[in-house]
Amino acid sequence: MKKLNSSEFRQMFLDFFKEHGHMIMPSASLIPQDDPTLLWINSGVATMKKYFDGSVVPKNRRITSSQKSIRTNDIENVGKTARHQTFFEMLGNFSVGDYFRDEAIPWAWEFLTSPKWLGLPKEKLYCTVYPKDEDSFNVWVKAGMPADHIVKLEDNFWDIGEGPCGPDTEIFYDRGQENNDVAEDDPENFPGGENARYLEIWNIVFSQYNHLPNGKYVDQPHKNIDTGMGLERVLSILQDAPTNFETDLFLPIIHATEEMTDGKKYGENDEDTTAFKIIADHVRAVSFAIADGALPSNSGRGYVLRRLIRRADLNGQRLGIKGAFLYKLVPVVGKIMESHYPEIMDQRGFIENVIQNEEERFQSTLDTGLTLLDDLIEKAKNSDDKTISGKDAFKMFDTYGFPYELTFESAQDAGLKVDKKGFDAEMQAQKDRARKARGDLQSMGRQDVTLMNIKDKSEFEYGVYEEPHAKLIDIVVDDKLVDKANGEHATLVFDKTPFYAERGGQVADHGGIYNQDGELVAKVTDVQHAPNDQNLHFVDLILPMEKGQEYVLKIDKERREGLRHSHSATHLLHAALRQVLGEHTHQAGSLVDPDYLRFDFTAMEPMTPRELKSVEELVNQKIWDAIQVKTTITTPEEGEKMGALALFDGKYGDKVRVVQMSDFSSEFCGGTHVDNTDQIGIFKITSESAVGAGMRRIEAVTSKKAYEYLANRSSLLDDIQEVVKATKPENIVDKIDSIENELRDSQKQVEALTKKINQAKAGEIFDNVKQAGDLTVIAAIADVNGMNDLRELADNWKSGNKSDVLVLAAENDGKANMIISLDQRALDKGLKAGDLIKKAAPLFGGGGGGRPNMAQAGGKKPEGLNDAIKAVIDEISNN
């Protein structure tokens, strides 16, 4: 039998069938194309439907592939069994009306047993066939399979209702009775039975019948072959691995995860081993799914991703890993799979970003959620029906981000149930509330008859800062049209106005309204568009105003100038991003404010410092080039011919306004702009950050605000230079490096002294041994600085055989910590550190967990530590 790594084995399979005239088909995306019946591609044959149903004829009727697949119907079993995975690869060979069993079976036997290929021991191979399928039985015997290794089973008929169907044959590898989970004389101990000895490695379906609606079976005109071999399963045989998780597809991920823990190792105990497996499986699944375009959300595929990421994070927490960590494993996955699937490394930054964002959302509530979940489990244990209520499960989902399935799994592990019907009812009630809220908002809009009945024209005047003769044509007070406004607030409509109404990301103008005598009668605080596109001026009244009178409208010029600078700079920024990052970069939103601008855009990964510098320099260069800004009113069609970018889903009227800055930038836009780019003065990016999956945000300032920003930075630099005592600005970095080195040296000295102090304290603590039942216990509140010091004391205790049980606690900065360690004698008595810590933690306002021999917890009520220690000692005494 050949020893192959995963890459070699995958390629060998494809090469074998290529030698037999097959076309190698690249793996399809995990997201089904034009197949609404599937959430994910879950097998190799799922990508072949168009060929098997005759809607598409392949260039070659013989096809082979290694298809990435996801199955999520039994996520809760992943990590708890040897073979369950959410993400896996299905190797397959397919015949679309070409060869049939006379070729498929001998080829399978050849690939498995030939020394040129896998070279598996023939005596280890078995197969099952459909009892009436004598042809397959005979072909197997002819190929070389011993007749007594062929089992006839009624289950060997592939049929999912109407459509193609037929008998199948499954191939099994005998792993030996020593690897079995049932007795040798167990009735399930046979190939195809429920046992761990005979591992199914390959399934060949002979699709030769058509299942009619009337229940009859008729021959298909073209017979097809559909096969599936689990890459991970066969690899476990080739690498002599007990389970799929000990192969080179998983072990590097598991080892990388071990490095993130506080010393936990795969295989040390069942609980931790399960957690390692879950993390390794789930990071593979989410990495490939995101690379193929899926993103976390609350429905469909997105919900599956969210559930997998959060399930992995929950298990990371159980291993003692703090904070977001799963995203750090993406490059490990990418490196393993790079030879056949380069997309992970190609999109590494984007995938990491999506996972990290999702993790950080969950991490913010994880600790609190776990504490609450522990409380709910204890509450349910003490209830008559041993059930977590649907209301409580929904609170875990709605408030703390725990998908129902995570609560269900935790309850199941504790021997409890969850009220699923109650959870569903709470979920539906929330949806109903949201739907009603949306309906109320819509109905409010529909029922705003007052604004809808305003038909008078109200024109906005570009380039005007003051309108001396604006006629007041409508007044709205308390949702009613009136002729006179003399209260505190009103909404006004003028026949013409210089005030820009908020639209397209640009906020509204502010300013004042004056009477013909020059008296200020109202302050304009906002301007919005009415249903019939009039400009609604929201004002704070100073003097009464009357319909039909003319007023002088004056906008805040400084605010308008800031808006013009920001809006034109936004266009330049958009164009610069497309030039530096590529034309795939699209605007996803913007805010044009007088003090700054915010621009959201599509991006697969964070911008590099070099890219940011290039964008900033390009925008400033266009500002200093003094480009004339040209506006044109035209049709949408003509605007597109001019090269203008059409935003906002292309929803435009008969006429559009195109804003051009030479051939560098051209966009449909109704906002206010500078006349020449040199009026912007200067442009400075202040931040670049993530908004969500696949979206980045740039914030920037212009003109006077940019000068103020740079002046503040310069002043800050002067302060830093003075603090670090650098002779000149260019020496600041070297000076800081020197200070950091000194700090590191000092920290090492502090740590060394702390260690000596802790050793001295350990002697005092460990001398005080108490008796609890027939076990010896050391229990104390130690004068140390938190959990790290407690762990160090626990390590000292382990090396000295000081007692059977160690219970140490500490108070630091108003927080409580506790650690419990058990030696073998205590474990033999049936004690578990995790159970003891869960009993103690609520007494000091905390939660925790751990392994049978060691557990730890943190809380917010240090005043409860003495009671907690007493509770642990009492529990030990009563054991």
UniProtKB/Swiss-Prot annotation:
Cofactor(s) needed for function: Zn(2+)
Enzyme Commission numbers on file: 6.1.1.7
Record keywords: Aminoacyl-tRNA synthetase, ATP-binding, Cytoplasm, Ligase, Metal-binding, Nucleotide-binding, Protein biosynthesis, RNA-binding, tRNA-binding, Zinc
Gene designation per UniProt: alaS
GO CC terms, sorted: cytosol
Annotated organism of origin: Lactobacillus acidophilus (strain ATCC 700396 / NCK56 / N2 / NCFM)
CDD domains registered for this protein in UniProt: AlaRS_core
Protein's cellular compartments: Cytoplasm
Cofactor binding, per record: Binds 1 zinc ion per subunit.
Function text: Catalyzes the attachment of alanine to tRNA(Ala) in a two-step reaction: alanine is first activated by ATP to form Ala-AMP and then transferred to the acceptor end of tRNA(Ala). Also edits incorrectly charged Ser-tRNA(Ala) and Gly-tRNA(Ala) via its editing domain.
SMART domains linked to this entry: tRNA_SAD (SM00863)
Record field: transmembrane: none
Binding positions for Zn(2+) per the UniProt entry: H567, H571, C669, H673
Family as reported in the entry's similarity comment: Belongs to the class-II aminoacyl-tRNA synthetase family.
Pfam family, one: tRNA_SAD
Gene3D superfamilies: 2.40.30.130, 3.10.310.40, 3.30.54.20, 6.10.250.550, Bira Bifunctional Protein, Domain 2, Threonyl-trna Synthetase, Chain A, domain 2
GO MF term set: alanine-tRNA ligase activity; aminoacyl-tRNA deacylase activity; ATP binding; catalytic activity, acting on a protein; transferase activity; tRNA binding; zinc ion binding
Catalytic reaction equation(s): tRNA(Ala) + L-alanine + ATP = L-alanyl-tRNA(Ala) + AMP + diphosphate
Notes concerning its domains: Consists of three domains; the N-terminal catalytic domain, the editing domain and the C-terminal C-Ala domain. The editing domain removes incorrectly charged amino acids, while the C-Ala domain, along with tRNA(Ala), serves as a bridge to cooperatively bring together the editing and aminoacylation centers thus stimulating deacylation of misacylated tRNAs.
The protein's name in its UniProt record: Alanine--tRNA ligase
GO process terms (BP): alanyl-tRNA aminoacylation
